[in-house]
Amino acid sequence: MDNNTDFPKAGFARLLKSFENTDDVVKLTRAFGLATKVHRGQLFNKSEPYINHALRVATILVEELQLRDCELACAALLHDTLEAADEDLKEYGERVHSIVSAATEPKVSAEEKAEILEQYFRKISQAPKDARYVKLADRLDGVRSMKGKAMRAARYKEETEKYVTPLAMATDDRLAFKLSVALYELR
């Protein structure tokens, strides 16, 4: 089995097992479909289909943290769709739309990045807990996927330690611990 290309089917099936309500399954299937469409042809870390990342973010929340919340899982699946395309997420409900909007990092040039990141993480630290959960699960998957990519990992690790670790500590001890372990494993 090629993990990079088979993961979307198996990973999504595994995600759905946590939800018994038919309406939840339909919502998750629609969100997964849109995320798959938006990210078609895109690679995460230049090495695997981008949808794998979105699925792992949802799985971190649903399986690792046991947050069995359909709208939160939909937001996790869709968390990078606003960055990739100008999608209207209102059809997924106001809560999903606001979580994704809050978790979306602004696109900036390299010169503006430090200042904008400072503002962004200040804003997200004041955002509802759901948005912080999605952002933290997103970063946790990003850190975990940096193993073996030393050049890129150094900058990502520094940014994570400066902005994301304090956010994790203020949001959920379990996420803070998982993030600390993932950062340690980058050494």
Regions found by a protein language model. Name each.
Residues 1-187:
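Active-site helical microenvironments for divalent-metal-assisted chemistry
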